Every structure is written in C-alpha cells, then in structure tokens.
Amino acid sequence: MKIGFTGIDMPEGKSKYNDLVLKALAEKDKPKKVSPFFVQFLKNEYVDCDAIVIHKDCLLDILILDMDKIESRINRIAEKDEIDLLNKCLLHLEKEEPLCTLTFNDAENKILKELSPPSYKPIIQIEGEYKINNIIEIALKETSNMFFYTSGAAESHAWLVPAGSDIVTCASKIHSDLARGFIKGDVV
C-alpha cells in the first residue's frame, strides 16, 4: 500500500505496521520468519498512492489541483454525461469538500478513475500529534482493506486483501495454485 502525504512532518519511505494480531500469532507459533505488512509513504505524491494523508490546513491545496484538472477536462470534452458529472464534482469541490466524500455510480467511477483527481482517493486529515500506526489503521479502513493471516513453524505472515474477501481471494494472495485448487472455506 502506498500513502501520499503533504503538509506534515513524517518519514518518507517504508514503514512497518505494528500488528498486534501478527505479533500474537508469532508468539504462539514461534516461526523462523515473521513477515509484517509495510506501507510506503510518498511525499507530495498523489497519483500512485492508495490514500492521501494531509494536514487539515492543506486540504485546499489538493482541492485546487482537482478543480484545475476538472476544469481543463471540461474544456476538452463534449459528452453531456461527463460534463454533468464534472460540474457536480466542481460544485462539491467549491464547498471545500474532497471528492471521496461523494457517492458515484459505476459509470461515474470509471470516468473519475481515468481522470484521477487526488481528492477522489481517500483523504485522511490530521492535525496535532499522530502516530504512524494510527495513520496506517485509518488508511486500511478508508481503502476498504483488511489482513489475512497465515502462521506456522516456518512463517507468520500478514497479507493485505480487500475487506470482505472470500477465502479463495485470500488464498490467491499466497499462491495462484492455492486459489485454483481451493474447495470450500470461510474467512473468520
């Protein structure tokens, strides 16, 4: 997972998530290897990230980027449905609200994913003291992700999967052959 950030003082690069569940599994199974989850923090990067962490005072900077991008797109297109969507987005941005707080249908989501305005991604606004682990937890929730764990004598591992994933999807994170050969199971 990649998290962009701006307006806050935090280290750029990879950060390990302090996962209490993985820690408990490792204490129980005493594996030779523990594979925790890492997040990559990217300073002032909005395109290649899954979520954006900003200081509350910097929200307008991102909204202005979105407005410029959307206004530029409106000037280049002629399809009424897309223009209506983009005008809806502009009105929302003018209220100083990020696009991630709006609900869109599948067709609108497709257009916005292609356009990729920064505030369409989950925005985590912070002020004052914060802990990196708390930011990661909020980002996981906002991006609708969860962990799938495997643990044994050889390794304890935290695998990132979309929230609500079935067992076959989780198994495919380990190896595609597991997903193909999986018969039945439940995520608990």
Give each language-model segment a name:
Residues V47-A78:
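Switch/coupling subdomain of P-loop NTPase systems
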Residues N18, L63-D66, I132:
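Generic alpha-helical segment signature
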Residues M1-C58:
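Conserved G1/Walker A P-loop phosphate-binding module
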Residues M1-P11, R76-V188:
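C-terminal-of-GTPase-core extension/linker across diverse P-loop GTPases
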Residues L25, I70, A171:
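Residue-level signature of catalytic and energy-coupling elements of molecular machines
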Residues K16, D61, V161-P162:
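Residue-level detector of secondary-structure boundary/capping sites
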